[in-house]
A protein has these predicted regions:
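A conserved beta-strand-loop-helix scaffold within acyl/acetyltransferase catalytic domains
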Residues: 70, 80-82, 88-101
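Conserved acetyl-CoA binding element of GNAT-fold acetyltransferases
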Residues: 102-115
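C-terminal "cap" of GNAT-fold acetyltransferases
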Residues: 149, 162-164, 168-189
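Conserved beta-strand-loop-alpha-helix junction that forms the acyl-donor binding cleft
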Residues: 143-157, 173-175
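Active-site rim helix/loop that mediates acceptor-substrate recognition in acyltransferases
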Residues: 24-80
Length: 189
């Protein structure tokens, strides 16, 4: 990766991270750029022709604390394509309590893809990649954050519904439900 490409990618990723308004993002851009350089070195000819369809990710574990809950760890998964034109950020608690049977829930806090890239299918591929990586980390249910809940009838609503995201009814007999868009990655837990 040339220095000019590295600087441009860093600028785009920094802009995406700044838009999330999170305060734990130190080191993420450097690690994503390192992942991009490693991935670029082993690209196939076909992948090299369309780098916007090749995704890289970085998982960061952070320590959190508040007076009510005490301390806990939180995982932050960031995902972007090699061109840095699409970006997603997801948080999930790595803890699973087998006594309470709480599912591990992932929360998509940022999902940025342009309309042009969405038309190419990059958005759908990115969310499928995010789901696969989340499931690999043991996430049972993937939620779209409250701030991202689309208005009914909009393309975002139709798109998320088409990807299998939905809302449970208030009297859902399953042991866990939320009134926001979500998708079950693992049916039994």
């Amino acid at each position: 990766m040339k220095e000019v490409e590295r600087v441009a990618l860093a600028a785009r990723l920094n802009a995406f991270l700044k838009a999330t308004e999170k305060n734990y993002l130190d080191g993420i851009v450097d690690n994503l750029i390192h992942e991009a350089e490693c991935k670029t070195a082993i690209l196939s000819d076909e992948e090299a022709r369309e780098p916007e369809f090749v995704f890289i990710s970085y998982l960061k574990e952070i320590k959190c604390y508040n007076d009510h809950d005490g301390s806990w760890k939180l995982n932050v998964l960031t995902l972007t394509n090699l061109t840095g034109t699409a970006f997603a950020l997801m948080e999930f608690d790595p803890a699973y309590n087998p006594i309470r049977k709480d599912p591990v829930c992932g929360y998509i806090n940022s999902f940025i893809v342009s309309e042009e890239d969405r038309q190419k299918g990059i958005g759908a591929l990115m969310i499928k990649t995010l789901e696969a990586r989340a499931e690999g980390y043991g996430v049972h249910i993937l939620f779209v954050n409250w701030d991202m809940k689309p208005e009914p009838g909009t393309w975002a609503d139709k798109w998320l519904t088409g990807m299998g995201y939905h809302q449970d009814e208030p009297n859902d007999p399953r042991p866990f439900h939320y009134y926001m868009m979500h998708k079950r990655l693992v049916d039994s837990y």
